Curated annotation (Swiss-Prot):
It is found in: Cytoplasm. Homodimer. Keywords: Chaperone, Cytoplasm, Stress response. GO terms for biological process: protein folding. One of its GO terms (cellular component) is cytosol. Residues 8-21 have a biased composition (Low complexity). It comes from Trichlorobacter lovleyi (strain ATCC BAA-1151 / DSM 17278 / SZ) (Geobacter lovleyi). HAMAP family: GrpE. Its main location: cytoplasm. This is Protein GrpE. It comes from the Bacteria. Belongs to the GrpE family. Residues 1-21 are annotated as: Disordered.
Length: 181
């Protein structure tokens, strides 16, 4: 039996079944079919709305990730450059002691250029100056110093500068903190 014959037979069987049904029964049967199709349409609509919401959430997440990559993608580069900056600062401190003005001037210029370049990318130093209130979100306490010369819980000395990339902490300032006796 081919496809056309099967379809014709199915239609004939359905016609026989509906011919045997009263008009009220046919109405009930049609209402049931309509309700089933309406439920299927509602389910499909809900599925479409969920898929749209998923797509919108994906777009937002992708946009956020792209923005973070643009803002913080240089993090590893900056982390590699910071020790160079530290060594330049140490060289400046020791060169002043030896009185080598030309060397000091050259290192100062290099230091300034490096700081300017880092600022262009949103890198700035954390305030770890003497007298600044200790903040564990930005400072790492390396030592506590008992002293009455400084207010309690303030920075006495900065061992290594901390840095921020935009608003994100790259590394904390390493400091000693005052503790009143």
């Amino acid at each position: 039996m081919n496809k056309e014959q099967q379809d014709l037979q199915t239609e004939q069987e359905a016609a026989v079944e509906t011919a045997e049904l009263t008009p009220e029964q046919q109405l009930v049967q049609l209402q049931e079919k309509l309700a089933a199709k309406e439920q299927e349409a509602k389910d499909n609509w809900d599925k479409l709305l969920r898929e749209r919401a998923d797509l919108e959430n994906y777009r937002k997440r992708a946009s956020r990730e792209k923005e973070e990559l643009l803002n913080y993608g240089i993090k590893s580069l900056v982390e590699e450059v910071l020790p160079v900056l530290d060594n330049l600062e140490r060289a400046l401190e020791h060169a002043n002691e030896d009185g080598l003005p030309a060397l000091v001037e050259g290192v100062k210029m290099t230091h300034t250029l490096l700081q300017t370049a880092l600022k262009k990318f949103g890198v700035c130093a954390v305030d770890g100056n003497c007298g600044t209130l200790f903040d564990p979100a930005f400072h790492q306490a390396m030592a506590q110093v008992e002293t009455s010369d400084h207010p309690n819980n303030t920075i006495v000395q900065e061992f290594q500068k901390g840095y921020l990339l935009k608003e994100r902490l790259l590394r904390p300032s390493m400091v000693s903190v005052a503790k009143n006796p």
